[in-house]
C-alpha cells in the first residue's frame, strides 16, 4: 500500500466554499462571492469529482472563483496551515508505514497492492472522504501526535473499505463487518497492544460477534486460546458450540469473506433464495 500525500489547491478551495466555514472571515468571503458571482460560484460545484479523478492534473474550465479565493489574505493563511498539516501527516506516515503495512499484510494474508493519492485539506474542515471510483482520499482532520494511531488506523480503514468495494456481493453488511474486525478492531489492537474490539458501528455489532469465533480461526488462534481472546476483547461465546475449522488459518481475506457469505445461514441465521458468490473485480 503506497500513499502519495499532496495538497491540491482547487480541492482545498472547493471544500472551503462548500463545507462549513472554518472562520468568520471565510464565511463572509463565501457570502460575498455568492452574492456577487452566484453563477460562477454554483458552476464549480461539479469540479469536486473531476479533481478527485485526477488531482495532479486538474485544470478548471473557469478559474474565476478559485482566483478570487486564492487572492484573499484569509486563504493564504489557511493554505500555509494546510501545507504544514501535510508535512505532519507525511512525517507520521513515514515513521509508521512499515509497521502498518507489515501488520496489514499479516491480517489480509495477501499483499494489498494499491496506491492512493491522499489529498490533505485544512484540518479544521473535519473531513475524511474516499471516492469509490478513484484511488483518492480526502483528509482534513486534526492530527494529535499522541493519538496518531487512531488517525492512521482510520485512514487504513477507509482504504481497505474502498478496496473491498470491488467485491461484488449483495451482502455488504458482512463485508463491512469483516472490514471492521480486520482494521478498526484487530489491526488497531495489534498496533496499540490493547484491545479495540469495543469500537465500531452499533449496526454491525451483532454480525461481528457471530463472525468473531470464525475470525479467530482465520487469525490462526488455537482453540485452547479462545478464552484468552474472549477475555481480552470482551466478546464471549460457548466454545463447545463451534467446530474448529483449521483450514481457515491458511486462506486469505477474500476467501474468508467468501466462506462467511456462503455459510451465512448457519453462522448468521441469514437465508438467501439465491446462491451468493463473491467476485473480485
Residue spans of the language-model regions?
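Active-site recognition of the HExxH zinc-binding catalytic motif
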Residues: 150-169, 180
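Pan-zinc metallopeptidase signature
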Residues: 206-281
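Short helix/strand-bridging catalytic loops that position acidic/His residues to coordinate divalent metals
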Residues: 136-145, 164-173
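Short acidic, S/G/P-rich loop/turn micro-motifs used as interaction or catalytic elements
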Residues: 125-127, 143-146
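Auxiliary, metal-adjacent structural segments of Zn-dependent hydrolase domains
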Residues: 73-133, 190-196
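N-terminal low-structure segments adjacent to metalloprotease catalytic domains
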Residues: 1-79, 84, 88
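Post-HExxH zinc-binding segment in Zn-dependent metallohydrolases
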Residues: 1-37, 170-229
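Charge-rich, solvent-exposed alpha-helical interaction surfaces
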Residues: 25, 29, 88, 92, ...
